[in-house]
From Swiss-Prot:
This is Small ribosomal subunit protein bS16. One of its GO terms (biological process) is translation. SUPFAM superfamilies: Ribosomal protein S16. Keywords: Ribonucleoprotein, Ribosomal protein. The gene is rpsP. Pfam families: Ribosomal_S16. It comes from the Bacteria. GO terms for molecular function: structural constituent of ribosome.
């Protein structure tokens, strides 16, 4: 199973709102997801409250177990909008 971190589109016509989700790559864009880890609102000014929010701990976990971010999610990480906490699944499992 190939797992992707991607955007799920919500909102009305011409007023998009996206959830940042972890989903199987074979599932359709707005289909079933494994976990919701944040949201992105392109209608709000960049950097303003409510523009983007992500659970960095869960993002770090999913990146650690091999989930591949899509181009847009990778762009958020590279630009510094998302701070991914470094941590692998092995270190998380040892803590539990």
């Amino acid at each position: 199973m190939s797992v992707k971190i991607r955007l799920m589109r919500l909102g009305a016509k011409k007023k998009p709102f996206y959830r940042i989700v972890v989903a199987d790559s074979r599932v359709q864009r707005d289909g079933k997801c494994i976990e919701q880890i944040g949201f992105y609102n392109p209608m709000v000014e960049c950097g303003a409250p409510g523009f983007l929010k992500v659970n960095a701990e869960r993002l770090g976990y999913w990146l650690g177990v091999g989930a591949q971010p899509t181009d847009r999610v990778s762009w958020f990480i590279k630009k510094g909008f998302i701070e991914a906490q470094s941590g692998s699944a092995a270190s998380t499992a040892q803590e539990a």
